[in-house]
Amino acid sequence: MELRPFATLTLAVASDGLYMLGATPAGTRIVQEINEARISGPRLNATLVGNAAADWLAIDAQGVGTFDIRMTLMTDDGVPIYLAYKGRADWSGGMGKSPVFVGMEFEAGDERYRWLNALHLFGRGEVGEGGKLVYEIYEPI
């Protein structure tokens, strides 16, 4: 499979939006609200809008993190789009110590962005400066 760069996604989490649910059937469940997000690329540029953005993270007994992230973005030209992605990270050495690998999908109703509906993108995320999570996103070609 060949991949080409699609965009960079940078997220910041809300320090007051962390909810530790504890042990659940899925593992230790942590809900972390996202208060900043920006996706930047040659074909898509958008910023987080609204208050309904979070990661529903579960970490199993072996330290594997399973991510479930959803948010609404507003493109720079004023079109709302939905982004959802899931992925995994081997955090047996500690949270944030290894990359996060994800599969991403968009939903768009506006004709200018319907092309996003056909994509399944792949990302590699790392914890960067200031605790922000930075994903390099790739598109299969």
Residue map of PLM features:
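Beta-strand-enriched cores of mature, soluble protein domains
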Residues: 1-141
